[in-house]
Amino acid sequence: MNLNELKKKAAWAALDYIYPGTVIGVGTGSTVFYFIQALSTVKHLISGAVSSSNSSTVLLKKNGIRVLDLNTFDFLEIYVDSADEINNDMQMIKGGGAALTKEKIIAAMSKKFVCIIDESKKVNILGTFPLPIEIIPIAFSYISKEILKIGGQPKLRENIITDNGNVIIDVYNLFINDPISVEKKINSLPGVVSVGLFASRVADVVLIGTQKGVEIIKN
């Protein structure tokens, strides 16, 4: 099986965590694309979805799934999203799709975070995949210098403006042995909107598409 088939396996397995009448938080990315397709088969059972990006909103509506405003809820029962990398502690790098800020907000408001990945995303140490940081544009020079101080190589992601009107710095060669500390450090920098390091709010369940089937890891 190729990676897309493994992603699809994990995405469809997430339906086991969907219950009638609930509102589903929905992430962004290629694996989530398969989850939205799967979710459309039970759309008559759920109350709707909260979307983490404009691109996911388009896909949800295209599949006939009602999209709701997050601000009308105090919490969500479940959030389903993928990750660019995930370690053994279920901490993640996310934001390859530039939706990290909304993803963090929805994850924080959700009782259960189900992460759907293919087996290539599982790592021992985070950082092989570049770490995304959403920043306001005027802060690029300052934040880049601060990232260099902690050993990372910052690069502006070209031709990308986030749904919030900001830009993305991708940090290369930053191998993250202490994810919680790094998350706090970067979040404290003036001009940072959000960092794509999910170290404090980890996944509750990870569904991993493998050649042998779907592996389930619970926190």
From Swiss-Prot:
UniProt-listed Enzyme Commission number(s): 5.3.1.6
Enzyme active site: 103
Listed pathway(s): Carbohydrate degradation; pentose phosphate pathway; D-ribose 5-phosphate from D-ribulose 5-phosphate (non-oxidative stage): step 1/1
Signal sequence segment: none
Binding-site positions, substrate: 28-31, 81-84, 94-97, 121
GO biological-process terms attached to the record: D-ribose metabolic process; pentose-phosphate shunt, non-oxidative branch
InterPro entries: NagB/RpiA_transferase-like (IPR037171), Ribose5P_isomerase_typA_subgr (IPR020672), Ribose5P_isomerase_type_A (IPR004788)
A GO CC term assigned to this protein in UniProt: cytosol
Cross-referenced PANTHER family: RIBOSE-5-PHOSPHATE ISOMERASE (PTHR11934:SF0)
Quaternary structure annotation from Swiss-Prot or TrEMBL: Homodimer.
Family membership: Belongs to the ribose 5-phosphate isomerase family.
Role noted for this protein: Catalyzes the reversible conversion of ribose-5-phosphate to ribulose 5-phosphate.
Alphabetized NCBIfam families for the sequence: PRK00702.1, rpiA
Protein name: Ribose-5-phosphate isomerase A
Species this chain originates from: Buchnera aphidicola subsp. Schizaphis graminum (strain Sg)
